[in-house]
Amino acid sequence: MSLYFPTPAECGRHVIFGTVPIRTYAGDGIQLSLVDIPAGGVVDWHSHPQEQMGMMVTGRAVFEIGDEVKELGPGDFYLIPGGVRHRVTSPAGPAQALDVFHPVRPEYR
């Protein structure tokens, strides 16, 4: 495995909230997560100590962060401070988002 150029097969693969597959790759202090939300998929309410930010790649998804709600589409960015409850749904069709976490989420290495 190349440290600098991992293949998709070499990245971490997990399923979150029962139906949402993610692929992950992490360095010492930062982590990427490619999230594929199926049509009707839900990343249910949760929080974590890591700071999270990301960008919608394809499709549309509704982000609920704290007490704010916004539908995002391709190219839209979001920021989720550590400790803030959040939820994401994709009611109209599949969606893909690219998340960045700092520090790394060890459970998804």
What is each model feature region?
Residues M1-G29:
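A short, N-terminal "cap"/entry segment at the start of jelly-roll beta-barrel domains
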Residues S33-S47:
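Conserved short histidine dyad/triad with adjacent acidic residue
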Residues Q31, R60-V62, V69, R85, ...:
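Structural motif
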Residues E68-G82:
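Short acidic-glycine-tyrosine-enriched beta hairpin
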Residues G82-E107:
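Ligand-binding loop in jelly-roll beta-barrel domains
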Residues Q50-Q52, M56-A61:
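Glycine- and acidic-residue-biased ligand/ion/polar-headgroup-sensing regions
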